[in-house]
């Protein structure tokens, strides 16, 4: 009788190992995070730059004003503002104005007592408007002005275009006629609004004083005179100073023993002003009509070329990064925001050294291998797959996963850009609130506000880096699920994102996995391990199947009992419950 014995023999193969993971880099960079401190990453996007000083320029896409009157040669802005005869010309519109006179220059005309009024701020006031023009008509008729009749005085120290005697076009130096040279009580003149609707009217006026002899000769009164101006609820009082002046002139012209005090008042649309005066008045004539706003920044001339940003300390800047370090100062245009320290955004993955196959001995001495670290050679992406086997090492990037990581970084960049815009708007709003003060006073930067914004931006970058680095686990987990689904029953999961395949997986195989086109059948893969069935013929020696099975089961049972007894004895000996002596 023949019996068939089925012997099951599992056919093993030299399996390859496929793992998910992240690229490695030999040149790690460092970024700061909110909770992990400094972290090495494979790439960064620098967010800050440190500018170098350059010349000032015209702001790109914006009308930029250097001098109030570009075609008025050898004239200061104060000359133009007061209407010096040789400094009359076109004053173009501008959205941005350069305060190029660190200390506003004097006027090349009659000597002015600058320290008694804010007249040096008049050019700054005009720079603060987008549109400025000098009226064609006079605001006050000198022939009918109270305290007259008058004749209009001129001076050799203020020559006109023909080099004859002249005076400022914004004022009329009214001197009583010979039959009217006598002291008068204060008289009042109304200053009407003559500009167009929507324009502010800047009215310039003043008074003249000299020594007693000249005061008596010119006005018939050598005593100090009183003057008052009032507009928009602002009232200013003056008393003239008599004598004590050395002969001098502002620039060129004839030296003078007298002085003039010049002031201005701003009249809002439709509002009138008043001036109360005695002898020596300089009555308003042509007025400035101004509208719109022009941002003012300290700088220097000439303006060369164009720039994205005008910065008080660095001049014209072209924006290459959203933030900058260095000196903090006022800036206008498409400018980076000041931050205290350099900032970098992670543009890659957390740095890992090149991967090594680590081996650990497990149960019954079996060796389990897994990868630790990052991969070298994956230049097409950040996340992907690697296989190890007889073919060596193959690496392939998963472009979709890499793109998702890049999208997250782009999202963070967009967020930081939005934060930049919001902070710029906040700064702009604060500057607008101070606009009226800025027109009259040199602007001071709010350093506390800048420090606060810098801290907010730095925190936002730290949190962004934290999110980018932490999202790696999400990408790897998604990659592992994708790989497991593609491999199906053709591989066994061995942990750490690795799978042991039941087939070879070279570079071609790995590329298809990365592309999502992997098909197990293309690599001669059976559905499961093959079984070899071997038939054995036994001679009929009187043993039937039942007898054979009985012998086998008896032997197996005896062996099992023997092993159990041996294990029990070893256990008891180890617990000192049984002693064993061997005698020879």
From Swiss-Prot:
Palmitoylated. In natural infection, inactive HA is matured into HA1 and HA2 outside the cell by one or more trypsin-like, arginine-specific endoprotease secreted by the bronchial epithelial cells. One identified protease that may be involved in this process is secreted in lungs by club cells. It is found in: Virion membrane; Host apical cell membrane. Residues 1-15 form the signal peptide. GO terms for biological process: endocytosis involved in viral entry into host cell; fusion of virus membrane with host endosome membrane; fusion of virus membrane with host plasma membrane; viral budding from plasma membrane; virion attachment to host cell. Disulfide bonds join 19-498, 75-87, 109-158, 505-509. The record marks 361-362 as: Cleavage. Keywords: Disulfide bond, Fusion of virus membrane with host endosomal membrane, Fusion of virus membrane with host membrane, Glycoprotein, Hemagglutinin, Host cell membrane, Host membrane, Host-virus interaction, Lipoprotein, Membrane, Palmitate, Signal, Transmembrane, Transmembrane helix, Viral attachment to host cell, Viral envelope protein, Viral penetration into host cytoplasm, Virion, Virus endocytosis by host, Virus entry into host cell. The chain crosses the membrane at residues 553-573. GO terms for molecular function: host cell surface receptor binding. It holds the Pfam family Hemagglutinin. Coiled coil: none annotated. Homotrimer of disulfide-linked HA1-HA2. Belongs to the influenza viruses hemagglutinin family. This is Hemagglutinin. It comes from Influenza B virus (strain B/Lee/1940). The lineage of its organism: Viruses, Riboviria, Orthornavirae, Negarnaviricota, Polyploviricotina. The gene is HA.
